[in-house]
Regions:
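Basic, helix-initiating cap at the start of DNA-binding domains
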Residues: 1-26, 31-42, 56
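Alpha-helical DNA-contacting segments of helix-turn-helix folds
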Residues: 59-61
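Short hydrophobic/aromatic patch on the recognition helix
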Residues: 42-51
């Protein structure tokens, strides 16, 4: 997560907004990391690079 915290604010906001929208619309179980990555305009690998797991991203929110 430290890598995520070192990102520029706009990039962090884009990822967080995408995650909030996906989780809010589909719920935790039906949201995939691929959905979040696509909405944020980054690769799925980068989401895992920043957070490690979907659960870690969810708890960050």
């Amino acid at each position: 997560m430290e890598k995520f915290l070192n990102l520029p604010i706009e990039k962090k906001k884009t990822i967080i907004d995408a995650a909030l929208k996906s989780f809010g619309t589909n719920g935790y179980k039906k949201t995939s990391v691929s959905d979040i990555a696509a909405a944020a305009g980054i690769s799925k690998a980068m989401v895992f690079h920043y957070f490690g797991t979907k659960k870690a991203l969810y708890f960050y929110l």
